Amino acid sequence: LTSAPCVVVMAGTATTIDTLDGDGRFLGGFILPGLDLMRRSLERNTAALPLAAGKYRAWPRCTDDAIASGGIEAQAGAIERAVVRLGNGAMCLLSGGAAALIGEHLGIAQRRVDNLVLEGLLRLAGDLPAAHASGKTNS
């Protein structure tokens, strides 16, 4: 999808932030609770916070909006830090159920790729005959 260094974000129940160098080598990554898990954790593990149904606000003034906004800010901040740390014109690829919502609040260039895992598998499958013909195997 890109030959640039890349931050790959899968935003679902958990949010994974993985980094690849320009040659496609995995450098490392992070796992965060997803947006819904963050909300549910606050509701279950605090004495008085509700299961928030708030909306994102730049400066929230009620508890529900503060919880919803805090989750988005945490996700966006972790993603943006990974892109800055990777440097060298890193590309950010977003996928998963919360990708659109998080993407709206990122201050970095990004590309949304629906079904990123399937896209990657298809690309790998397309490379398999060439890899086997040249004698490369993963065993």
What label would you give each PLM region?
Residues L1-C6, L122-A131:
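Conserved phosphate-binding catalytic cores of ATP/NTP-utilizing and phosphoryl-transfer enzymes
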Residues L1-N45, I72-V83, K136:
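Phosphate-binding/catalytic loop of phosphoryl-transfer enzymes
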Residues T13, A98, V117:
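A generic "binding-loop/recognition-motif" signal
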Residues I17, L101-H105:
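Short active-site-adjacent structural elements
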Residues T46, P50-G54, R61-C62:
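Conserved, helical-rich catalytic subdomain that frames metal- and/or nucleotide-binding sites
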Residues Y56-M91, A98-L101, A109-Q110:
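Adenine-nucleotide phosphate-binding core of ATP-dependent small-molecule kinases
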Residues L94-G97, N115, A131, K136-S139:
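ATP/nucleoside-binding phosphotransfer catalytic cores, i.e., glycine-rich phosphate-binding loops
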Residues G107-L122:
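Conserved phosphate-binding/catalytic loops in two-lobed NTP-binding clefts
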